[in-house]
Amino acid sequence: MISLFWADALVKDLSGPQRVSTGISPSGPIHVGNMREILTGDILFKAITKRGLESDFIYLCDDMDPLRKVYPFLSKDYERYVGQPLKNIPAPQGAGKYSDYYLEPFVRVMKEANIPARVIKTSDLYESGMLAQACDIAINNREKIKDILETVSGRKIEGDFYPYEPLCEKCGRISTTHVISYSYPYAEYACKCGHHGFADIRKAEGKMPWRVEWPAKWFALKVTVEPFGKDHGAPGGSYDTGRRIAREVFGIEPPVPLMYERIILKGKGAMHSSTGLAIAASEIMEVIPPDLLRYMIARVNPGRHIDFDPGMGILALSDELEKLQDAYFENRASLDEDQAAMVEYSLVNKDRKPYPVDFRHLVTLVQIYRTEDEILRAVKKGQPSDFIEADFRKEIEYARRWLERYAPESVKFRILPVDQKIELSDSDLAILSDFLNGIEDMPWNSESIHDRIYEISQKFKTNPESVFTLFYRVFIGKDRGPRLGYFLFNLGKDFVRERIRNVIRDH
């Protein structure tokens, strides 16, 4: 049976060597929404590789793009840099360049998430001369390109059009220059600052405008597959103009396209670096395991938007993934091909299940125990021989940080002191006494505790939920809490016994 998983379906008819390309303009923090592009590309790359085809995966950093405005997260001092390439602008903090400041944390995220893309800076493509031929072809076909842009986009281009934007050697801007004449390899230009000069297209002394540069990269880098956002794929958008320029100017077929929808931040809208409405990818990778981030992207067809809830949504997502992972490693035949593919493309390490303890339960443990060593002692028994302590300590940190930054109050709790007094009814006391009377003979594990709670609810002809609420009130002073069987098991029989005895004694 052939998998209907979206990535496998897209690449099933490909043949010969393939190159998957993705990219971004590092104009601000590279956020979770941007992860959809590179992870979609990575999943396609892995699907191609799985088919046995020779494949390569690149990630283009458009560091030659100009700073378009002073974004909300920048100081007003950046007004002086508007129009200059991102690679030439100082970083918002510390030494270094603006583009590297936002790119480098994302490169670390790529490594953690097992994304083997080669990062290529657009400035290096220009400086090395790799785009020189494409620049020359584009400039020599400027009237044809102008006609395509006007016809497809529906927008009139005024004045003498050249598909090249020189970098002014005086003011350092790209956005304020225009080409006067061209004789290979030099573009003569004038700038609004009053400077007149020449730019060498064999170097990073200018760039093509985006709608021309994109197909030029397909040509120069031999790109065969590329995912892109819906803004580029809109009617009359840059993919529509790009595929015509690819065919009619560069004489190539455009890459196999895959348009993806946005990631929507719950209650706020689509993420954008320029508006400040975003969670940085490096930030989210501090609070959730990489497999979970990969699964969030893999599970949803790219044509549908993703609702991202960094609060309770993370717990629901982790429950879903862990259930599938259990089946994948223990009884793969129980999964359909689509489900198996989702898990396969989510795993950072395909040889073993990544979570020795599920994320939801780990969130409970970090609130019960004070140290990592205590948590390790609590879970180490019964773990497989390939249990890796260092990896599990990472998981503990994910849970701690998620709890601090994104967990809703309903998930947080504090264990009440063993002698804390609370108000209880006679029926509450009877239920607690019954539980206490049987505690010594009861096997102390989560399943037995869970079953015992249900037995008591039947014996006292009361709703099980009310019994659960009673125990939560006794131990954390709230009406709801973590899964009770696991919770009481990890508190330990001695503490549970002593706490219930004290509560009963106070009445």
Swiss-Prot record:
A motif ('HIGH' region) lies at residues 26-34. InterPro entries: aa-tRNA-synth_I_cd-bd (IPR045462), aa-tRNA-synth_I_codon-bd_sub2 (IPR020751), aa-tRNA-synth_I_CS (IPR001412), aa_tRNA-synth_I_cd-bd_sf (IPR008925), Lys-tRNA-ligase (IPR002904), Rossmann-like_a/b/a_fold (IPR014729). GO terms for molecular function: ATP binding; lysine-tRNA ligase activity; tRNA binding. Its EC number is 6.1.1.6. It comes from the Archaea. The keyword ATP-binding applies. GO terms for biological process: lysyl-tRNA aminoacylation. It is an enzyme of class 6 (ligase). It catalyses: tRNA(Lys) + L-lysine + ATP = L-lysyl-tRNA(Lys) + AMP + diphosphate. GO terms for cellular component: cytoplasm. A motif ('KMSKS' region) lies at residues 270-274. Keywords: Aminoacyl-tRNA synthetase, ATP-binding, Cytoplasm, Ligase, Nucleotide-binding, Protein biosynthesis. It is found in: Cytoplasm. Belongs to the class-I aminoacyl-tRNA synthetase family. PANTHER family: LYSINE--TRNA LIGASE. This is Lysine--tRNA ligase. The gene is lysS.
